[in-house]
Amino acid sequence: MRVALVHDWLNQSGGAEDVLAALARIFPAAPIYTSIYAPERVSAAFRERDVRVSWADRLPGIHRQQQRYLLAFPFAFRGFDLSGYDLILSNKSGFCHGVRKPSGVKHICYCLTPTRYVWDLQGYLERERFHPALPALMRPLMGWLQRWDRRAADGIDHFVAISSAVQRRIARFYGRDSVIIHPPVDTDRFRPSEQKGDYFLVVSRLIPYKRIDLAVQACTRLNLPLIVAGDGRDRARLEALAGPMVQFVGRVPEADLPDLMARCRAFIFPGREDFGIAPVQAMASGRPVTAFAAGGALDYVQA
């Protein structure tokens, strides 16, 4: 069976890219189609794959600020020629599900989420801390993007949701049924440890919608030790909010992460996420998880 993998953008490392890497291992001969690709910013494993990019990859500055080119992505994915395949498997949180499906080809969408800034523009812009005037400027475009997104969803043969929360959003925004398959999580290397530290832990990309500020402010006010592992464009703002008990350690090497997880007092997961891989790894390490009571975390964290 000839399979094409389709992914929104390969310019960052996170849970979506972990899912793509797992799909690539399942289908080792499948090329990866994506809008943009910055090999230096993602796992080296992708450099061994056949990654095919769209014309959008040549736009200036897009590797670091793809949000500026929001309207380019629907057209970028429509430009791919996927004839010659038996199956298209899209790993979607943005616009990649909008690829053209040739006659006779099946399209399965592994839906990380219906596109946030298409269906929840106000909330997305508030979480990302854009200029307050931007919603009014973008609102006329949202009607077009929502119609485009719905038409793209109509062309998909089968939807797979990563959590119950995403399944409900697929039904609400696309009017489609879906099955739930939780994302693959590497838990084999995470084990409980008899050595315990006295710190709380956050492991995340430091971007506004992850709401790491809630954990930073809570631990600062309560004078509790917190280690924040990860990096991103929100780091400077978070450091300005932090008290002396909050330590930012940057991106932690994968080899060091299991020990950091196993020794924490508890793992904090403050955002409204679609699923959440790091909390599952923390539980595999035998550590309790404190999560915001919404989103995908409700599938695996119980009070």
For the regions a protein language model found, what residue spans apply to each?
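Acidic anion/phosphate-binding donor-loop and adjacent secondary structure
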Residues: 168, 172-173, 184-198
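Acidic donor-binding loop of glycosyltransferase active sites
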Residues: 262-274, 287-288
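Short hydrophobic beta-strand element within catalytic cores of glycosyltransferases
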Residues: 288-291, 301
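Membrane-proximal helix-turn-helix segments that form the acceptor-binding/catalytic region
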Residues: 127-159, 167-168
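Short glycine/serine-rich donor-binding loops of glycosyltransferases
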Residues: 276-280, 297
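Conserved donor-binding/catalytic core segment of Leloir-type glycosyltransferases
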Residues: 191-227
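Nucleotide-activated donor-binding/catalytic signature segment of Leloir-type glycosyltransferases, i.e.
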Residues: 236-258
